[in-house]
Amino acid sequence: MSNYNVSLVGPAPWGFRLQGGKDFNMPLTISSLKDGGKASQAHVRIGDVVLSIDGISAQGMTHLEAQNKIKACTGSLNMTLQRASAAAKSEPVAVQKGEPKEVVKPVPITSPAVSKVTSTTNMAYNKVPRPFGSVSSPKVTSIPSPSSAFTPAHAATSSHASPPPVAAVTPPPLSASGLHASANPSAAQCSSPPNTGKPAVHVPRQPTVTSVCSESAQELAEGQRRGSQGDIKQQNGPPRKHIVERNTEFYHIPTHSDASKKRLIEDTEDWRPRTGTTQSRSFRILAQITGTEHLKESENDNAKKANSTPEPSQQSASPLSAAESLESPGSNRPVVAGLRSAAAFKPVGSTSVKSPSWQRPNQAAPSTGRISNSASSSGTGAPMKPAVGPPQPSDQDTLVQRAEHIPAGKRTPMCAHCNQAIRGPFLVALGKSWHPEEFNCAHCKNTMAYIGFVEEKGALYCELCYEKFFAPECGRCQRKILGEVINALKQTWHVSCFVCVACGKPIRNNVFHLEDGEPYCETDYYALFGTICRGCEFPIEAGDMFLEALGSTWHDTCFVCSVCCESLEGQTFFSKKDKPLCKKHAHSVNF
């Protein structure tokens, strides 16, 4: 290796150009030289490889990094180069190291490949998958797969590294296509011997194996056609049209009996999953013979209606009853009557429909701030009783919540207090379940099943204890605040009490102004007490610089000449028709 060092005295230009870099997958080399330049005078040649720049190795540098490194050398440029004659020998190896991965090579059709396949065709696990009796031609083994012509060389080598039974499978489409027949154990069912009796009867019962075998039969037929015609056109996959026309013997249905012929020619209901209410095909054929087909269909329709109607009716009736109990808790109408009317479509003698009961009311609408009295009614149809408790707070955004009563059912939740399974009716509050007797106030220990509660500092308190110990007092009405609190003027207020004096609307968290100790919203304050700038017609807020001129108030930046917009603050100005003018335009402009 003939390496040499070059030291070029600054400043730039250095008289050469670079090419390559890590981002181009090429070494940094000299691409051109300027005649009479500094690099040419230092005997630098075109094609020399740059090994280092200013003592830093250039092997990992990108093209831009190398340029910036050279630009940073202002006083002198020191480089280590390698002659192009010595670097030319190792150049092709380094550049073309990754090219074999990108070269697309078609699989050649050679005679050694035929001999290799024919030598292994006697093995039992290397037989060609034949689609139920079709005879495959030995010529097809020498025809490559259409997709193998587009397979990279490294993919071909990886396929040869697989075990011999898998690599020696005769039809290449099974290993190259997306059918996964070589990796799927069920594909071995396709290679049935040709002497199998009556194979076509099982075609509708095995859709997966049939699709795999039809694909392989299609590709074998396509390979035979291209091999006989000498077609060299490469495709990106086997054609998938006219499968029935090319492989008509595969879809041949033997006429051994009228029953099997009728099963294959009629509709394909066997492909659908059967339920307990649908009759078998033999039963329907018998019904057609005896003339009772329409009678059975009407009975089946009634059975389907009986099975499909009660389940939604229970789900839809229980939210309806819950909604009725929320809107009119004082009504004495039994909720069970609504369920019975919804389940009136149950046919006589049907045992698959359960009698209406309080099994699924836990799917009703969530709690809306009132007590759901569904727990007080049992399956016997006892009338509901209205909730007894303190009056509802007047705050619309109150913090007081109510527990939701859930009757006993299939669900067995865990109590949030004792961490035990709840057997029977329970309460739902704050996303947790509670025993009714354990949902008590943290201070007075009274039950909160039928009264409101508030969560404060991780504990639950009834609304009376919360109002007594925690709720702040309103600065206007002197009542306890159970909802949103407004903190203003060092006091706490109800939202409905802290309002604008002029318009009476709640100020909430908006900006307000005080005038004579009374709060005003921003709009009313500037309309009543604010000063409007004559120039911009916007209010002059507190802290704004302003001046008075021509009988009006102006922002200091708004008092300008009406013609040239020059600021007139602290200067002599003139007025024509109440418009300020500077000295230049005072006598030259007429309005």
Swiss-Prot record:
PROSITE patterns found in the cross-reference section: LIM_DOMAIN_1, LIM_DOMAIN_2, PDZ
GO cellular component, one term: cytosol
N6-succinyllysine sites (modified residues): 89
Modification sites for N-acetylserine: 2
Low complexity bias (residue ranges): 144-161, 310-329
Disordered: region residues: 125-240, 255-334, 348-398
Biased composition (Polar residues): 134-143, 183-195, 207-217, 349-380
Gene3D superfamilies according to UniProt: 2.30.42.10, Cysteine Rich Protein (2.10.110.10)
Metal-binding as UniProt keyword: yes
Residues found modified as N6-acetyllysine: 89, 346
GO molecular function: actin binding; actinin binding; metal ion binding; muscle alpha-actinin binding; protein kinase C binding; signaling receptor complex adaptor activity
Location of Phosphoserine modifications: 2, 111, 134, 137, 228, 260, 313, 318, 355, 357
Domain PDZ as annotated: residue spans: 2-85
Crosslinked residue numbers (Glycyl lysine isopeptide (Lys-Gly) (interchain with G-Cter in SUMO2)): 89
Subunit structure: Interacts with various PKC isoforms through the LIM domains. Interacts with actin and alpha-actinin through the PDZ domain. Interacts (via LIM domains) with SIPA1L1/SPAR; this interaction may occur preferentially with isoform 1.
Function: May play an important role in the heart development by scaffolding PKC to the Z-disk region. May play a role in the regulation of cardiomyocyte expansion. Isoforms lacking the LIM domains may negatively modulate the scaffolding activity of isoform 1. Overexpression promotes the development of heart hypertrophy. Contributes to the regulation of dendritic spine morphogenesis in neurons. May be required to restrain postsynaptic growth of excitatory synapses. Isoform 1, but not isoform 2, expression favors spine thinning and elongation.
PANTHER family tied to this protein: PDZ AND LIM DOMAIN PROTEIN 5 (PTHR24214:SF32), PDZ AND LIM DOMAIN PROTEIN ZASP (PTHR24214)
Protein name in UniProt: PDZ and LIM domain protein 5
Natural source organism: Rattus norvegicus (Rat)
Gene symbol of the encoding locus: Pdlim5
